[in-house]
Amino acid sequence: TFQNHTPLTFNDVFSGIAPSLAAATSVLTPITFLIQNTFGPITLNSLSLEIVSSEETSTATIERVWLDTYRIRPALDTTLRIVTRTHRGVEETHSLPLRIPANAPATVSLLVASGVDLAQIEQQGTIGATQPRNLNQLIRALNNTYRNNRLYVRLLGAHPGVLLAGEPLAALPASALAVYQADRSRGAVMSLQQASLGEWEVDTQEAVSGFRILTLNLDSQ
């Protein structure tokens, strides 16, 4: 915990090569970022850790994904099925209810990814990732760091937007997009090619890797 600030939280799984080092790094790195941040002073009050260790490998890969509904349309409630396979070959099916937004474009992509893979995709600049511009944003970003034991689901559409003052503004009307891109007095503006129309997470018991993408052509009827 930090004095007069939101506490940092940790909940993750590390497995494979040097998991102890990875776990220690995951704790020390965000604390170091905050202590050495350039936005303002911050004081560490306390640190509480609960560690569970095991001799067994605990990893899984994303094998396949599909939707229960064959004809997909805007404003539809459906269920996403995600199959993961452990290093021992055991498959597990995860179910995630989700809703296709009413304003979704004719073609959307459904991305299911591990935290590592999602971070790499965001670094390519096609999906907006928040860039901290102050201490509160930095703490929020660190608490939202992608974890190994999560399945991250993103519904993506070709709605251009901008990254403004560290915050993604997606699915902007053409007129608003032109204003943001022309008005440099607001600070650095970066164009985004895709908008996240929906975001979900699924907890797992393993450290997950891999990603799958479904391209969906929405039925207008």
Where are these regions (language model features)?
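Long, low-hydrophobicity ectodomains and other hydrophilic envelope-associated domains
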Residues: 1-221
